[in-house]
Regions:
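Conserved histidines in hydrophobic membrane contexts and catalytic metal-binding motifs
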Residues: 28
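Catalytic core of pol beta-like nucleotidyltransferases
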Residues: 1-25, 33-39, 52-100
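Short hydrophobic/aromatic beta-strand micro-patches
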Residues: 46-48
Length: 100
């Protein structure tokens, strides 16, 4: 199993926990999605959050830590689709691989 499959499987295995935290959809992008990761690469994760749930900054930090732990404790960069800059959004969405 390659790194991308491992990451996708881990996120899918924790779908119910992430859903309970207000996550509707999760995707992987960046070098992991392109299968170009190296030992120094982080794992880039894109989230769609349930806007009906009020997620404050503390909840978001806890969610990022939860995802980091799910993915083995390494370097993980978590962004929301809503928080993406317009200049990055098209590229990120194009290369994203959906977990759920």
């Amino acid at each position: 199993m390659n790194e991308l499959e491992t990451v996708i499987d881990a996120l899918r295995a924790h779908k119910s926990i992430l859903n309970a935290s207000g996550v509707l959809h999760v995707a992987v992008f960046g070098s992991t999605a392109r299968k170009e990761q190296s030992a120094d690469s982080d794992i880039d994760v894109l989230l769609d959050l349930d806007e009906t749930q009020k997620i404050n900054v503390f909840d978001y930090v806890a969610l990022k830590e939860q995802i980091r732990e799910i993915l083995g404790g390494g370097c993980v960069d978590v962004v929301t689709r809503q928080g993406l800059k317009k200049t990055l959004k098209d590229r990120v969405e194009k290369e994203s691989i959906n977990a759920f």
